[in-house]
Amino acid sequence: MMAEFHYGGQAVIEGVMMRGRRHMTTVVRRPDGELTEDTQTLPSLYTGRLRTLPLLRGIVVLIEALVLGVKILMYSANVSLEEEGEKVEGWLVWVTLAFSLVAAVAVFFVAPLFITNQINVESNVLFHVIEGVIRLAIFIVYLELISLLPDIKRVFAYHGAEHKTVNAYEAGVPLEVEAVKEYSKAHVRCGSSFIFTVLVLAIIVFSLVGIAEPTFWMMLLARILLVPVIAALGYEVIYFGARHAGNRLVRAILAPGLWLQSMTTREPDDGQIEVAIAALSRVLEAEESEEAPAEAAT
């Protein structure tokens, strides 16, 4: 029996990507107001057995988010720039991604460690709690700053549209704008909740590493090498939370991550909801069209 699949997506520039079991569809609103779409079959790496294995699936999802995320952002950016006759070069996007990853590790992992190291803290646990609070504070300030940018505000609104659409679909209501707009712009499986979970888990994991009383440089190396491990653990927490979202204790644990979504989502307008609905509808059609021949053969 095939396990239940949870649809999800990502907001992009003037659009939304929705991911199915074996397909993903990106729908973007062109400068002239028309919608354009791109549906692709997902590589086997993102749909095979590795994506079902605990811990390993978290790393696969992380790779998928980075690689496919860059591709769909490049697609949406090029659609948005069509009117100006410009195009985003692929190599520039990958260079930007590499720089962003290095900057993210430096700002969210190296900087908090360096700052905390300047404070005379003897307790291993307290040291890592302070470091974790600094890391979380930096992340919140970062979100506040980028949310001031007009283009990012629109991406956050598409993020809200994506959540509303998935929530409506999971509730079994028709995928129509008037029905979808009534649903919440927060979702338990959101990447924002995942990031918050990772930041909290980092405190626990780094505290365990600190028991060995490593040098500053060893702690720094551990911060970098353990990022994939913490991400894998974070995915398992979100995966468990999504499957037990009705449990009050689970919802209480996930509440801070849901709160964080108030910073990464905005109330979408009808046009943005229309884009999200189109993306989910197209990927559902792609999934159904693939299953139909197999059913006919039986």
Regions found by a protein language model. Give the residues of each.
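Membrane interface segments of multi-pass transport proteins and intramembrane proteases
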Residues: 80-87, 114-130, 210-221, 240-251, ...
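Alpha-helical transmembrane segments of multi-pass membrane proteins, especially transporters
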Residues: 97, 101, 127, 131, ...
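Divalent-cation
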Residues: 1-74
